[in-house]
């Protein structure tokens, strides 16, 4: 049965049957550790690689000695406010040595501002919070592969892949010859390369490979006879057309593979080659005078302490690779699986940054060399030589435009957390969506405990983007490790010793599942145990090497938040995991009644809650800050974020959860953030749900909700939009932010202050002015009168036009904040901008028809109707249902978890506690029924009366079971009892149908219960046994036909809100070429009337409607103006003209050289005019005076055909998780 457990500030009853051996690690340590490594080691490595830089004569030498990072100029909050990058200055100590004179100059050189990672594992770049996603790439090393020739023969290939440098590929052909390709050039016999390495004669080569017949075959194909000839042959292949010499050939080969500056295997490449070829060359040892040694886990022996990995290729590597290839040809050895996580590694922030920094430094190195030759040697200093532009540019480019530097998904805390733990196979040096096949995307057995098999986007990126498992960590080589408990084989007991293994280390071990039953001392209870090796096998207990630490180690955080995951189909679980990340933070967050026990950890590590740094006592609590006197006597002040905007426009607001005088421990949550409730993740609300159809309103996954959810703000959320307006210098003079706007009445200006900026607290609607701004107009020749006015009134009469910032269509709300930045106050602004105003508008959005909702099991739907509370179905005690879901959504989708959640939720609500049911280790059906029974007893108070009456539980349940058998099923019995009651039978007859005997009823009556109470209590007990009860129609009060499943389910409101999607247009921008309205909400476009819609009108014979749609409502430019005028004047709409698309068609045909004319009925040629002529003519006819340079409104076309510039860089366009079903 469940046991209570303290989770943060709340107690949850845990239904888990296994104890947790290992706590979850810090969930964002992937990011933090990687960046820490970069600052401490990564930067130093790059400087060592590039240092020293020598000029072409070898006279001047520039060395990089040491580096320091200064303090950042602004805090994180200030950076967000001012749109600057959170960065610290990097200073490098540089030494310049002049070898001729022996002169040494040292200087500290500033190398640009380096972006810093925040506590939360993110970067602030130009004021926006960004995340660097870790990339899954193929590890450097040697790979063997086999293909089958059309003739049925196995052909083998071996590839040596470096971290950077030339590839070396070996392959065999049908005749068992071995060939090599150097850096993707044409193939040559492999023996040519062996000879070039210094094994010149045939005998030496044959001896090297034990006279293997395949090598002898290859030698027969080899036309070279000595080392020199082989070198020349290779040179000819690599540099065709250049005169080959032995020396140049030797230096080319050396620089390709054996020069650390040009070829780098990285530590991981050396480790992988060593692991595969096992030839013992791993380190280059430094001098070891003190004789200190360390134990090496890879070589399994003591080695000198001062050592470094050999990062370039060696002759042995090449020889051993060919030897292994020969082994494969002789049927020994194994080929590699490139989708195995032992062959794919993670490049996290640190390494990605290091590579980028290296690119910048190598560009700088070229500049330094050039400057060394040009500048005067005597006056030269390090500062003069070093140009930091390329370094700064490389870093800026990486953070600004790399595919792996992403705008952080901040919809809710889970979205933030998951984004930081995301693994992507895309990006530079990775795969591309188009080329990635099935195998790469598929779940692989090596993903177990490392990468979640469930959480991945639907759509083109499926399987290419994954999520790190809960307990996984990254080792020094970038491989993902997962923890196991070691099994003491001698005593056959599972110890608490934790061992982290990578995917290739794990191969060959037998690993038991976490839920294998153990006794008190940790020994296996069963003689045979389920295990992996790597297939699922049943083995004797004494063969087990390791055991999983927890059932949730397989899954990611989002997946492990789904209760009863074990009862859901994987496809639906995937949707559930992804949709939790789209849940909008609600005004009144509520932790789930049925959780999985990791809600607290997820919220804590996401960084949205405030955590006490030290233990102490709370001295002061306000809505904006908390003060704690710590145990050392100092005062710690914690500032809270109030109603700020997240990247996705949701509201970030923190509120204290501690009281004055309360004792606080270090690490305790002291303030809740968005979507958290007492430090636990709270993405939605617990609502009372019934699974039943209702008048067709929940057809096809639609959802019926009660008006109560609207009234009581169950699903109300706050959304904040940011609008900005800048005043720039133009050619005609500076723009001005002012309240003095031409042709605008006082009514419209009522909410602007004297600067022309809207006041905080104003309610605004579409079209309202937020910031008044005027821009100088082109000066025209002035008349004498105007010159006189100008002379009298000065500049004021100058021509300006209104370019104020207005609230866009379809947006409205309250102004919650205004920020003004100006040159005069010393704020950093882009060039040409004098003043910048930002206005923040907040909206309270209640739930409404068209909003998308979902549970945690992939059960999503759109609200079809909001029904008055009194019309909703109600329970026997009169409580109205809050949400009605369609039962048909369950069987075919196979996500039964939602039904179990509803039952357990009901029990938890009645018993008044929260429960946690961890994944694959949660509540069983028995324990759910047990909890429901307890709830029934508690609600009806039956137990105390039974004790008084001397009735025991077994007796009562036995009687009910008998009645159920008689009725045929539990549901049938409920129906029978309800029927008896409503058909006017006596209460006693109804009670007897539940199985109670007259004697039992008498005893209960003596104990103080009335017959009505006894019947009510028995109905509750029947509900507890089936999870179903009779509901009544709120409109008629009649009972529904069958008993219905009712319970509490956790529902989320997703970010696909109807307010963001609904859109209407009367007139608006037109496309430049076709003159048809643009499409889409972003462009304020029209609705597409497509081919099929046209067919429909044709089929109806609606000729005039059709003509209008194809002409005046679309691209008949003149007709549009005339029709508009006719409507305004109340006249009849004139005949349509020629649509622009027809003119375009004619122009296209003419451009093909076809002479196309348009003829009238009497064969007269009709002249097709251009738009400008047309408008001019029309204007004349209508008597409109068009001054020069002014066209009517209609022509103000929006030049972006489809997508506005802002949208080009709008994250939503590039967000990999777009939901295909919703964004059609």
From Swiss-Prot:
Enzyme Commission code: 2.7.7.6
Gene Ontology terms, MF aspect: DNA binding; DNA-directed RNA polymerase activity; ribonucleoside binding
Catalytic activity entry: RNA(n) + a ribonucleoside 5'-triphosphate = RNA(n+1) + diphosphate
Keyword Nucleotidyltransferase: yes
Pfam families to which the protein is assigned, alphabetical: RNA_pol_Rpb2_1, RNA_pol_Rpb2_2, RNA_pol_Rpb2_3, RNA_pol_Rpb2_45, RNA_pol_Rpb2_6, RNA_pol_Rpb2_7
Any one Gene Ontology BP term: DNA-templated transcription
InterPro entries xref list: DNA-dir_RNA_pol_bsu_ext_1_sf, DNA-dir_RNA_pol_bsu_external_1, DNA-dir_RNA_pol_su2, DNA-dir_RNAP_su2_dom, DNA-dir_RNAP_su2_hyb_sf, RNA_pol_bsu_bac, RNA_pol_bsu_CS, RNA_pol_bsu_protrusion
Class of this enzyme: transferase
Alphabetized UniProt keyword annotations: DNA-directed RNA polymerase, Nucleotidyltransferase, Transcription, Transferase
Gene Ontology, cellular component aspect: DNA-directed RNA polymerase complex
Tagged with keyword Transferase: yes
Residue runs in coiled coils: none
Function recorded in the entry: DNA-dependent RNA polymerase catalyzes the transcription of DNA into RNA using the four ribonucleoside triphosphates as substrates.
Subunit structure: The RNAP catalytic core consists of 2 alpha, 1 beta, 1 beta' and 1 omega subunit. When a sigma factor is associated with the core the holoenzyme is formed, which can initiate transcription.
Family, as annotated: Belongs to the RNA polymerase beta chain family.
Protein name: DNA-directed RNA polymerase subunit beta
Organism of provenance: Pelotomaculum thermopropionicum (strain DSM 13744 / JCM 10971 / SI)
Primary gene name: rpoB
